[in-house]
């Protein structure tokens, strides 16, 4: 009986990791679309705004987490927007923009 519980627990851990690794690309695109008003379609911004296309994933993740934690100035709406995403969503959005050509 004890072995059965261990096997079930191990299976659940393995499956949860798999579920986290596979984020639906359509969800990621819809999350990233909320950035288009300021940062342009696919992260290619108009002059005067920061482009996100091609920015390394780690850089975008860190900035978003800094906004979310209140470590960045509140001069924009980013501190509010970033709180609406989980860390996993932020990582997925950052990966999406990193993959875009600038």
Regions found by a protein language model. Give the residues of each.
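Inter-heme linker and motif-flanking segments adjacent to c-type heme-binding CXXCH motifs
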Residues: 44, 73, 100-102
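C-terminal capping alpha-helices of c-type cytochrome domains
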Residues: 83-102
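The canonical Cys-X-X-Cys-His
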Residues: 33-41, 93
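Bacterial N-terminal signal peptides that target proteins for export
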Residues: 1-8
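Electrostatic cytochrome c docking/interface patches
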Residues: 13-32, 48-50, 66, 101
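Gly/Gly-Pro-rich "capping" loops immediately C-terminal to redox-active cysteine motifs
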Residues: 28, 42-71, 80-85
């Amino acid at each position: 009986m004890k072995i059965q519980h261990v096997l079930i627990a191990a299976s659940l851990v393995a499956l949860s990791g798999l579920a986290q690794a596979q984020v639906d690309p359509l969800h990621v695109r819809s999350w990233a679309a909320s950035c288009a008003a300021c940062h342009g379609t696919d992260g290619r911004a108009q002059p005067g705004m920061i482009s996100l296309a091609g920015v390394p994933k780690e850089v975008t993740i860190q900035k978003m987490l800094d906004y979310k934690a209140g470590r960045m100035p509140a001069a924009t709406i980013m501190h509010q927007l970033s709180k609406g995403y989980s860390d996993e969503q932020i990582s997925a959005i950052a990966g999406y923009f990193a993959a875009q050509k600038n």
